[in-house]
């Protein structure tokens, strides 16, 4: 009798376990239906090319809690510091005229000036960014966060925007009075003496 009762208990327990497993499948389905993957932060990207059309890197923009994260990667450049800015027009034409000055032509001049240059002097343009350091191996990597513009500011206006790597370092208009008693001149306040335009990418 005891053995029969034990077998009955085992069979009953097994039935309950199997019933529980069958119900578990439904629960999993409910979890799958109600769980949603978090949406990716809005972002944009620019592929950097030199005047010959060769790709030299990229710059990505994404929204983060503190503002806009900017991540720049370059390769194949000479070691040293390079000026890095967002320009006001989304055109990267290798031989073009500057907006409003058709008599002046050069590499990527169609990208216009720095984003926000009409509202402030360098280094307080909205498009001004920290300098990009390229190592002895010819590669450079920069991550920074700015609250001067959002991703939509770069792509939502009619003429877009572009990222520019300049041929030299940006002094951010930091010219001590012992060198220039009158302070930085107009050219320095415009570009930080970063030199010509080396590579450009339209923000998309």
What does each model-found stretch correspond to?
Residues 2-5, 11-14, 22-81, 86-204:
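N-terminal leader/targeting pre-sequences
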């Amino acid at each position: 009798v005891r053995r029969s009762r034990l077998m009955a208990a085992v069979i009953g327990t097994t039935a309950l376990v199997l019933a529980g497993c069958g119900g578990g499948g439904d629960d999993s389905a409910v979890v799958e239906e109600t769980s949603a993957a978090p949406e990716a932060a809005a972002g944009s990207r620019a592929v950097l090319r030199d005047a010959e059309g060769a790709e030299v890197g990229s710059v990505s923009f994404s929204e983060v809690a503190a503002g806009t994260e900017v991540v720049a990667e370059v390769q194949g450049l000479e070691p040293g510091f390079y000026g890095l800015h967002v320009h006001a027009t989304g055109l990267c034409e290798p031989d073009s005229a500057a907006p409003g000055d058709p008599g002046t032509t050069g590499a990527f001049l169609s990208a216009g000036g720095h984003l926000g240059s009409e509202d402030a002097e360098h280094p307080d343009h909205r498009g001004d960014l920290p300098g990009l350091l390229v190592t002895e191996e010819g590669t450079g990597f920069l991550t920074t966060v700015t609250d001067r513009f959002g991703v939509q500011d770069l792509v939502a206006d009619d003429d877009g925007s572009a990222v520019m790597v300049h041929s030299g370092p940006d002094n951010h208009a930091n010219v001590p009075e012992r060198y220039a008693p009158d302070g930085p001149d107009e050219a320095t306040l415009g570009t930080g003496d970063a030199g010509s335009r080396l590579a450009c990418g339209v923000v998309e």
